[in-house]
Amino acid sequence: MCRGCRKCHETAECSILDDTKKLMAEYEWADKIVSVSPSYWADIPGQFKVFIDRCTPWCNTHEPHAKISGGKKGYTIALRTGPSMPECEKIIGSIEHFYGHLEIEASGKLGLCKVEHKEDVAARTEEIQEFCEGICRN
């Protein structure tokens, strides 16, 4: 969890030794990044937020900052149990905000409401496949 020490604002590196660098190496390797998030009280889960906070060394709002290579495309899928698409849009907005600070182009999004059980996802297979095929085409 980010401690707010701001060392990364001076060195572009974090003082915490965990797997964040390994995960960011995967981001560096990838051309396309797909983030999928359920709704936890109308936003991304705490674990996802902790990861985003830990990516501060790569955030383009301060210099120096670590960088991943450009030209990456980011896609987002948000799921929630309720019927309100604005809640999915809030989740998508949080993830696209994260992408923006890593200079990843937000290139597609899918919000899935009324998803509580596996069967609810299975009923949306065609919609999900179309979204995934779009990722492959772009």
Where are the predicted features?
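N-terminal beta1-alpha1-beta2 submodule of the flavodoxin-like/Rossmannoid cofactor-binding fold
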Residues: 1-60, 100, 107-138
